[in-house]
Design a protein with these regions (language model features):
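Bacterial Sec-dependent N-terminal signal peptides
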Residues: 1-38
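Start-of-domain marker
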Residues: 25-105
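Hydrophilic extracytoplasmic domains
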Residues: 28, 256-326
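Short beta-strand elements that form the blades of beta-propeller/WD-repeat-like
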Residues: 102-108, 175-182, 247-253
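Beta-propeller blade signature
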Residues: 119-129, 192-200, 268-280
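Short N-terminal edge-element motif at the start of the domain
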Residues: 122-169
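Beta-propeller fold detector
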Residues: 133-141, 205-214, 285-291
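Short aromatic loop motif centered on NTY/YTY
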Residues: 149-157, 161-169, 205-277, 301-302
Length: 326
């Protein structure tokens, strides 16, 4: 399977999950039948441009599609109560509702060339009167040497395509943890764990003192960590998701397959899992979640396939937590 196809199925799986969450989370807000027809018509137009953002053969095609898509999306979202319209036909765009339905976040990426991927994003807030409150997110990743040790806003966001939102509450404050994917370089990918809060003016704040590495050595640096990521070999499959039964974010422990620990593009799963558990308003790092898990034949465990034998997306697999190794 090509990298483009793998990315497409990653987004498709994200869309299926977000559709299920939206159906469960959204309250009784409604758009009129007339506005529904408008939104459906807009969605039909948006589909082509959303597809070409990812699949356009030339950079110019992709960037033109991206520019038109953004303008059309904003026009669509200005339709009253558009917040409740799922845009579920836009399969190359991630759309996630917060568990409390207070906002949703759109994210996607555009390929400049084989070396550079840019992320796009916007947060749509739910409003009482159905009007549009939209906060564009500007990807600042390529201008940042140390993306993990700074609190940021919408204008200097560390871009990612989000596939999960976990909501916690501490001292009366809602804290949202975003899990996201970044097609980082030609040789490696990243998966991000980003904490999102909102300030008194309702503006997004990304990052903060929400990570604790007390009594372990897994920390990215000796300085405070305001967000967390793993970087790994482009062809590797990695787990990085929330397990509600454990109240933990669980992810693969990585090692260099070439014994070069400073080259993260050589990192692959070794069969062990690490994680973070929520405790007293912070994500506390857990160095080892399950027991030793290396397969007897020395092969690295592979992430469960999302596609079934017929080539369709197996939704039941999307709902399963990482398998606990014996």
């Amino acid at each position: 399977m090509t990298l483009k196809n793998r990315f497409f199925f990653f987004l498709l799986a994200t869309c299926l999950i977000s559709m299920k969450c939206a159906a469960q989370a959204l309250p009784g807000g409604r758009y009129s039948a007339k506005d529904k027809l408008k939104l459906e018509k807009q969605q039909d137009s948006l589909k082509l441009f959303a597809f070409n953002i990812v699949n356009g053969e030339e950079p110019g095609q992709r960037f033109r599609a991206d520019s038109v898509f953004i303008r059309m999306l904003v026009r669509s979202l200005k339709i009253p109560n558009s917040f409740y319209f799922p845009f579920d036909s836009l399969q190359t765009i991630s759309k996630l509702y917060a568990p409390d339905s207070s906002f949703r976040i759109f994210t996607w990426q555009i390929k400049k060339d084989v070396y550079v991927f840019l992320q796009r994003g916007a947060i749509q807030m739910r409003t009482a009167d159905g009007s549009l409150k939209l906060i564009p997110l500007h990807d600042f990743s390529m201008f940042t040497k140390r993306p993990y040790d700074s609190v940021r806003n919408a204008n200097n966001w560390i871009g990612a395509i989000y596939y999960r939102i976990i909501q916690k509450n501490y001292n009366g404050k809602n804290i949202y943890t975003l899990l996201g994917f970044d097609d980082f370089t030609i040789n490696s990918n990243k998966k991000w764990m980003e904490v999102l809060t909102f300030d008194e003016q309702g503006q997004p704040v990304f990052g903060g003192p929400y990570f604790s590495f007390k009594n372990d050595s897994a920390k990215i640096s000796n300085k405070p960590v305001d967000r967390f990521y793993i970087e790994y070999k482009k062809e590797a499959s990695t787990t990085f998701n929330y397990d509600s039964s454990l109240n933990m974010i669980v992810y693969d422990h990585l090692i260099s397959e070439t014994e070069e620990p400073k080259r993260q593009e050589t990192f692959v799963p070794d069969g062990d899992y690490e994680g973070f558990t929520w405790l007293n308003g912070q994500w506390l790092h857990v160095p080892k979640v399950f027991g030793n898990t290396m397969k007897l034949d020395g092969q690295f465990p592979q992430e469960q396939k999302i596609l079934n034998d017929a080539g369709g997306v197996d939704e039941s697999l999307l709902k399963q937590p990482p398998e606990k190794k014996k």
